[in-house]
Structure formats: structure tokens, C-alpha cells
Amino acid sequence: CLVGSEMCIRDSTSIALKIHFPLAWAVKPTLYKQFVGGETLQDCSAAINHLMKYNVKSTLDYSAESEQTPEGIQATFEETLRSIDFAKGNTNLAYAVFKPSTITTDELLAKASEKREELTIDDVRHFREFRERFMALCQRAYDNDVRILVDAEDYCFQDAIDALTDEAMRKFNKKRAIVFATLQMYRHDRMPYLRRIYDDAVAKGYIAGVKFVRGAYMEAERARAAALDYPDPICKDKQATDENYDAAVRFTMDHLDRFEMFMGTHNEESNYKLAKLMDEKGIARDDSRVFFAQLLGMSDNISFNLAHAGYNVTKYVPYASVRDVLPYLIRRAEENTSVAGQTSRELRMLEMEMTRRKEHNPAEGR
């Protein structure tokens, strides 16, 4: 079972990290090479240039899972600033991105979002510092004219993130979308939230940036909801999630005068539906307000074929040292347990992509 193998890899890697076992020799030429752009921004140049051969832009994602200490948080914040500066004026790079939980602590995000207990004086101070870092990243993106994606997090963190993202969009998105909220459409409350974003954008005169994903923490979210006795935030089944996702995309396309959209999915049907919808609405395939996106090393046949057809496409390109990015690779394996059926599809797609490359350039297949 491939998923079982992934879980075995995850468990073995977790143990190896704890005992400081050297893993780079095994990981770097395999998983790391497939899914990671390099250790530094400069190291990603080869991946960026390779993708641009197929008219696919890159979105560099600093994926180090630093400890949530003041030093670790500051280091991640500073590296994210560098990634925004690196993207300035670079037409090969489509967006910058950051994960809010890397510039604060999980505990603070949960307390601020769930409001189950009063924030202490220290909590209030730390949240103010988090807000300052959050807004500083958005300000740097605005100053550099670089669009920035605010990644979604666990349900118990998201309310605080949504509030800051809404605030940042009102401030920085007056003329175009700079700041993008991420909506995990396996949450059944995201369509009402999308409509609130639209109403707010109309009322306050800004362009909302939205990134759509399905979501990757289904088992954990349901388990936590059951343990703490609150309503399950996840759609009842995959069909309901797909319908929610499709509804969000259509709503956004119906109101594109107030939106820019980043569609992050490896689902072939979702990509096809959006491409078809753009053509039906007479929206140019290269309209800068709409981007398709996949992860580096996954669904290349979707990415390259869309780009070849003239649509805007970007790849998330993670970067960090081998050791620091291992938790990201472990999470990829964990997330795949939620979409076990996709594994065989990815293998078929990989075979298709290898065949396509051999036909396009026989030397590349050797």
C-alpha cells in the first residue's frame, strides 16, 4: 500500500530527526530533488528556468519548519522578506507566499481565534507583534508590487488569520489585488465567507485576492471537533467539497471585477472547468487576474498543458535546507492519506508526463 509506505517514511523520518540521524544522503537525490527547488532563493534558479521553458512561472515558498522560538520566528520573518524582495521585478515569479503560523506560535493563534479563554497581557503583546510582522510582509509586497498569498491553516487558527488578511486586503488592494486570502473549500463555511469578502470589497472599494484549495487536514479537523465537542467544520463528503469548490470558482468568475483568483488544485476536472468557463465568458486565457497552480513535482501534465494552451500557470516551489524542509515532505505524505485515490492517478500522470517529455525531447528521457 503506497499510503502505508508514506506513513512508514513519515514515522521513520520523524525518529531520524529526533536522534539527529543524517538523512540528506538519502533524501536529497530523491524526494528533495523532486519536490524542492533548493536550499536558498538563489538555488531555485535552475527550477525557475526549467519551468519557464514551458511558460510556467514559479512561486517561491520558504518551507522551513523552524522552532516557534523568538529566534526561529524572526529568522523566518526575515527570510520571507528576502523572498518578497527576490520576486520584485522578476517576471518569472508570479507570487510570494507565507504561512502565518511560522511568524507566531500555534498556541497564540488558537487562543486568539477560538476565544475559549481570556488573552493574558503577554498574549496581547505577542499578538500585536504578530500583527506587525504580518502587516510588514504585506507592506513589503505592496512596495515591491508583488502579489502575496496568505496560506490557510488549521480551523482553530483561521479566524485570527482571516481577520488580519481582511484588514490587509482593505489597506493594500485598492488598485489591484496584492494580498490574497486562502480559502479551504472543504470547510462548509467558506462560501458565506467568500460572499462577505465580496460585499466588503464592494463597500470599501478594493480588489479581493482569493486562493482556492480543497484542504488537507480532514482527519485532524474532524478528530479535534469531536474531542472538543464543536460542530465538524468539514463538508460531509468529497462530492460536497467538490460542489463547494466549484461554486466558489464560479462565484468569483461571475464577479471578476472585484476579484483576482489563484486556483490551487491537482484535480483535473476542476482545472478543465475553469479553463472552459474562462473561454465561455470571453476572458482572455492570459488575463492576469486568473492563475492556475500546482506544486513542484506534481501534476506536471496539467501545468504544462494549461501553459501551452495559453493560460497563466505557476508552481509552488518550496525551498529550505534538507533538514529544515523534511517536515514539509512528511506533511505531503500525511496529506496524501486523505486522498489515497489520487496516488495511482499521480503515478499515471507521471508516466504520461515522462512519455510527453520523451516525445518532446528524446534526450531528456535517457
Annotated model-derived regions:
Residues 5-6, 10-366:
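Positively charged, amphipathic and often flexible ligand-engagement surfaces
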